[in-house]
Curated annotation (Swiss-Prot):
One of the GO biological process terms: mitochondrion organization
Keyword Cell membrane annotated: no
Record keywords: FAD, Flavoprotein, Membrane, Mitochondrion, Mitochondrion outer membrane, NAD, Oxidoreductase, Transmembrane, Transmembrane helix
Gene Ontology cellular-component annotations: extrinsic component of mitochondrial inner membrane; mitochondrial outer membrane; mitochondrion
Protein name: Uncharacterized FAD-binding protein C17H9.12c
Organism, as annotated: Schizosaccharomyces pombe (strain 972 / ATCC 24843)
Cell location: Mitochondrion outer membrane
Length: 266
C-alpha cells in the first residue's frame, strides 16, 4: 500500500461508515412505518371525516397512514375487511370509491353487529385497521352492455363503486326503508351520468319496477342483473344463495322467470 493510499484510508473508512449508518437508519426508519393497505396484515387508517346521514347510518372517510398502492390498479367490485381488535372480530365492507388516497364507506349501525358498532364509536382522528383489498366476485361486469341492479340499504355501496368503473348504462332499483329517502341517490346520479335510479319506498318492489325502463336499446338477454342487500332481500328477489361454497344457487323469487342474460347475487 502506498503512503498516499494509507493517508486516505481513514477518510475512506469514515465515508463507508457514514453510508452504512445512513442505510441502517433508513432501514430502521422504514421498518417502523405502519404498513400500507395489503391483503396479508391489517393496516392503520385515520378517520378523516364522519358525515351522519341518518341516526344509524353515516359516511366514514378513512385515509391511509402509509401509501396504499394496491388500490390503484384494482378492478371493481372490491372490498376490505375491518376489525375490532379488542374482540378479534372482522367484517367485510365495500368502499364507495377505489381511491389510493381515501376510502369512503357507507355503514349502518346494527346493535347486534359488533364491527358496525365499533366503527360508529369512532371519532374523527381515531384509527381503524383495514386489510385487503379483495375481489367480491370473479364476474367481469365490464363486458355487459347494460346493467340492472336491485339493491336495498347499504347494498348500494358495491353498485356505487361499480358504476364509476363501467361505461355501460346502469339502471338501479333502489329499495329504502319506509319513510327514509334513498341515501346517496343524488350523489351517485351526479357523479355517474350513465346511472339512473328508480326509488322504491313504502311498498314492496315488483317485477315492473325491475323491467320497465324508458329508452332501453339493449335486449334483456344481453343484460346483467345484480342483486345486493340483506340475505332476506336477495332471497326474495332472486332466491337464496347455495348453502355451501360461493355458489350462486338457482334463480327463484321475483326473478324466477328470469329474462336476464345473467343474474348475480352479491
Amino acid at each position: 500500500m502506498s503512503s498516499s493510499t494509507y493517508r486516505k484510508l481513514p477518510k475512506i473508512l469514515a465515508a463507508g461508515l457514514a453510508i452504512g449508518c445512513a442505510g441502517g437508519y433508513y432501514a430502521y426508519k422504514n421498518s417502523n412505518k405502519p404498513p400500507g393497505l395489503n391483503p396479508e396484515i391489517y393496516a392503520p387508517f385515520t378517520v378523516n371525516k364522519i358525515t351522519e346521514l341518518t341516526s344509524d347510518a353515516s359516511l366514514f372517510s378513512l385515509v391511509p397512514q402509509s401509501p396504499s398502492e394496491h388500490l390503484t390498479t384494482l378492478e371493481p367490485i372490491a372490498k376490505v375487511t375491518i376489525r375490532d381488535p379488542s374482540m378479534q372480530v372482522q367484517r367485510p365492507y365495500t368502499p364507495l370509491y377505489l381511491d389510493a388516497n381515501e376510502l369512503k364507506f357507507f355503514i349502518r349501525k346494527y346493535e347486534e353487529g359488533p364491527v358496525s358498532s365499533y366503527i360508529h364509536s369512532k371519532k374523527e382522528g381515531d384509527t381503524i385497521e383495514l386489510r385487503g383489498p379483495f375481489k367480491t366476485t370473479k364476474l367481469d361486469c365490464t363486458k355487459y352492455p347494460r346493467i340492472v341492479a336491485i339493491v336495498a340499504g347499504t347494498g348500494i355501496a358495491p353498485i356505487y363503486q361499480l358504476a364509476q368503473s363501467v361505461k355501460s348504462p346502469v339502471d338501479i332499483v333502489y329499495c329504502s326503508r319506509p319513510g327514509q329517502p334513498p341515501l346517496l341517490k343524488e350523489e351517485l346520479e351526479k357523479e355517474c351520468p350513465n346511472v339512473r335510479v328508480k326509488s322504491v319506498q313504502n311498498r314492496l318492489v315488483n317485477i315492473h319496477d325491475i323491467l320497465d325502463w324508458d329508452n332501453v336499446t339493449v335486449p334483456l338477454k344481453d343484460t346483467l342483473c345484480i342483486v345486493c342487500g340483506s340475505q332476506k332481500f336477495v332471497s326474495t328477489i332472486a332466491g337464496p344463495k347455495a348453502d355451501y361454497g360461493a355458489r350462486q344457487g338457482e334463480v327463484k323469487g321475483l326473478l324466477s322467470n328470469n329474462p336476464f342474460g345473467k343474474v348475480w347475487k352479491l
